[in-house]
Amino acid sequence: FPAASHVEWEDKGGYMVADFRSAGTVMQAWFDAAGKWYMTEEDISYAELPRAVRTAYEAGDYAAWHVDDVDKLLRNGQETVYVLEVERAEQEFDLYYSEDGVLLREVPDRDGNDDHGDMLPQELSKAISDFIARKYPGARIVDAEREKGNTEVDIIFAGKALEVCFGTGDAWLWTKTGVRLSEVPDVVRRTLQSSQYGTWGIDDVDLYESPDRVWYAIEVEDPQSEREATV
């Protein structure tokens, strides 16, 4: 970053993080103690987003929300990610997109924290890398994190965002894919409609695949009491 100015350093979780300006743009770069670069966060305008990201956002569920901020995350060895901070009334969400417009995740922004340290690239074990390459050939690695002793890897495969979870010994546990209600088999929808949750609103639908079965997890909400359940 030869044009960097107004540089300020701080330690964040063992990473050395530089906040600076370059050519009038606010940026942040993450390094380890040995000087290895991991990620750069760059503030950009909505107009600077790739056309595919703008098209996906404008066709999505948050199109009517106000875009408050846009960040571009350049990461060592992993996908470039674009983060749109959107708000409506008292609600705020961070929307993560790949360069080709795949919505990777939607995260409620409850604390106003703009730190994207959770998107730092992580090294995967050979067993996990080999499994993903075999089961999802050509998949692109977006993110990986340790969660409750498991390793969760976000990938893009066949134009969709998948979350692949591995447990003890890097054994594959399940893969989750967000789907539309229209993609759910009729028998599953009929079962839901005839259950105690048949009149509840549907918030989200995920398809799970594991080594021994396939199932759907449907998040529902009672419009009267605002109670929520997953069935």
For the regions a protein language model found, what residue spans apply to each?
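Interaction-mediating elements
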Residues: 1-80, 85-231
